[in-house]
Amino acid sequence: MIDQYFQKINERLKLVLKHEKDNLKKAAHAVSKAVQNGGIIQLFGCGHSHIMAEEVFYRAGGLVPVKPIFVEPLMLHEGAVRSSMLERMNDFAPSFIDREDIRSEDVFFILSTSGRNPVPIDVALAAKAKGAYTIAITSLEYSKSQPSRHKSGRLLYEVVDLVIDNHSVKGDAILTHQNVSVPFAPTSTVVGSAILNAVLAEAIALMAENGVEPPVFLSGNIEGADEHNRRWIEKYKERIPVLIEGCQP
């Protein structure tokens, strides 16, 4: 199974590169433009999808102005089954998204592989209503195979400005075995993280080519990194309070 899993992951990545490259470039241009215009990059996902938002936040070699929206009841550590129940609730999203600082100069990524649950859809609609450029990382195969749970009947890919297909299969699990009754081994987190890092890398290059110093974190385990990073944190701490939460003034 080890070889098969790596093979399947490579197949998904090749599909993304082949079919989504134009949209990856569009996303990178939007990110580059947002940062140059004083905006930030915001990300939201429920359950395991939040892992991708965390992957690119405060990341060595990553873009500084990245703000994940963490809603703990929608993550896993406060109750896994409960988090799924809440994600399926219509009108739950306003309880947290309405108080978020989302601006028209921002880019907002919504991460949901199935794309059918109300909370990610409502978050996308809220971000769009505030003028942000919305990008979904989702699976079109998966989404189109299942009915929406949103009261409007729409799926995530139908409400955003740009869609990047992660090419996950229906149900996300990619492997089978004759003695196992259900498919297993998901791909969406690995592929989604690659998509995000590729988009941000391209955006960093675009800024540099435009004569703009890209705000990039150095690894905190490299000597001199604290001084380098402190300058960028100071610049973005008001828009991204989670960068300094819990620190002494």
From Swiss-Prot:
GO biological process: carbohydrate derivative metabolic process
Every SIS domain range: 31-214
Molecular function as annotated in GO: carbohydrate derivative binding
Pfam families linked to this entry: SIS_2 (PF13580)
Family statement drawn from the similarity comment of this UniProt entry: Belongs to the UPF0309 family.
Name by which UniProt lists this protein: UPF0309 protein GTNG_1302
Organism whose genome encodes this protein: Geobacillus thermodenitrificans (strain NG80-2)
High-level lineage: Bacteria, Bacillati, Bacillota, Bacilli, Bacillales
